[in-house]
Amino acid sequence: MSENWLFRDKDGNPFMPIGVQAHNSSTGSPFIRKALRTLELFGGNTLEAPTYWYFVEPEEGVYDFSSVKDLIDEVREAGAHLVILWFGMSKNGHPNYVPEYVKLHPEIYHVAKGHDGRAVASLSPHCMATLERDKAAFLALLQFVKDYDEKERTVIAIQIENEMGYANTDRDYSEEAEADYQKAVPEEIAGLRFPDMWGEEASDGQAAGEGNCDNAVQQKICDAGNGKPGDENENAGVVSPWKTAFGRYSHEAFSAWYTAQYIEKIAKAGKALYDIPFYTNVFIGENAHEEAGLCYNAGAGVSRMLELWKIAAPSLDLIAPDIYNTSLYDYRRICASYKRFGNPLFVPESPVSGMPNAMNLILAAGEFEAQGVASFGAEGALDENENLNPESEEIALSMHIIAKIAPLLIQYHGTGRIHAFTQEEFEPWRYLKLPLHHVVMRYTSCNSQGFGYTTDVKSKEGRKKIARRGRAILVQTGDYEFYLCGAGAMAEFIRRPDPMDEDSYGKMSSRYSSQLNFLSVDEGHFENGEFVCDFRRNGDETNFAQYVLDGQLIRIRLNPCVE
């Protein structure tokens, strides 16, 4: 339902960001123009683009927001919206975009240490000096955005940092961090449990961190944890309270808490200055062996740590997964994981090319009701003539589909009336059971017919449309009214028998006749939230199935009186 929608336009209306993200170093007009060209070809409405700490604060305490002004102006002139990506102390866990005064003074702005005591390529969130300078620069940026854009609201959200966490270590082993590791686990998270943290599932009634030991491994750790922390050498033999609380995930939970708290301090101060949606993006944990520091940034808001992050950083409006996984299995579990604990799903990064993501974007928007989607590397979608590369055409088609039906995705969010269909390998059709109707979504690549279309499906272009991999989003807006948007798909509706009807088979046979089954089928678009009919289908174009070949949006009104 729209009242639960996070993103809003300047009039306060719910808004679904659909778009692209510029490359990391895409700053300046030529690069942004190319990104906006891709956005146009994708049918999107929102550009995500970075702003760099070292650019806006070249010297300590000296700020220059001319690049931010130029960025807002170009996006506004294009009639689009903007999500600013704050590249502060972290870009994929690395300090690439910090000012030189930070890089040149590691004695002040501490670099994290690995388990061998050597520096790793990440700044430490335990360092308050780094936090205070990062926060000051972010607040200065936020003040500029508020002063320059609050009325127009071209900027609809700000991403704080980029894929936070440690690269190449599971936690910070510096002296500063070691002292924190020996402190008590914060009460807010002491009762959390993570699956398999003791090598087997804890009993349902047992929460971690309550001082109880529910298996031999935990008992051994609890017994060892009775020592008192002393100097650094003594600490080497002392078990941290984090270990007794979280077992095998103690280092990851420790890193996640301090990383999330770092962002929380920035976000909380930001909310007091300008109430605009804040989120952070995540280098997700669903990678390879799924071990922190090896397969993803330790301390990140991965699905395993999502509940901890939501507790530690309540000023963030959402925690967003960057999803580059192509497998359907992975994609579904990632989307489901990030819809927990009151966290809205938003996918700020995904591939800009390839059939897998073209299918997965439909699932994100339809099945998992994401509040926004975007593809990374906008400029890479264009050829030398600034037309779409063939590899990006299917992504663009899926973005167009989502954009056309977005008003209904917002209106019917969370109602159970939104259904996504994506054609899996070897799949000719899919069945959906609704309270009053059977729905069969057939995919034209496996159910082709040479009639019943307004397109000449025997032409080269027509054959291409028929053969494409099917995808669609179906929204039920009434007992007998549906909207369908997609490509390579055609829907059949049959009213289900009444429970007490003795002649159910006879009526089912009659209802199978499409000629009797509908009142109207209109092809159209939404304008200011209202559906506008561009073309009314009838006769051959409705008698066999209700089809969408290349991104059409149709409204289907079924006949409630068919017998």
Give a label for each model feature.
Residues 32-106, 259-273:
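Aromatic-lined substrate-binding rim segments of carbohydrate-active enzymes
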Residues 362-498:
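Aromatic- and carboxylate-lined catalytic core of secreted/periplasmic carbohydrate-active enzymes
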Residues 265-275, 304-409:
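Catalytic-core region of carbohydrate-active enzymes that cleave or remodel glycosidic bonds
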Residues 17-28, 50-68, 116-136, 148, ...:
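The substrate-binding groove and active-site-proximal loops of carbohydrate-active enzymes
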Residues 108-306:
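Polysaccharide-binding and catalytic clefts of secreted carbohydrate-active enzymes
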Residues 1-45:
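N-terminal carbohydrate-binding accessory modules
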Residues 455-466, 481-563:
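C-terminal beta-sandwich/jelly-roll accessory domains of carbohydrate-active enzymes
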Residues 25-41, 296-312, 331, 358-361:
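Short, acidic/polar
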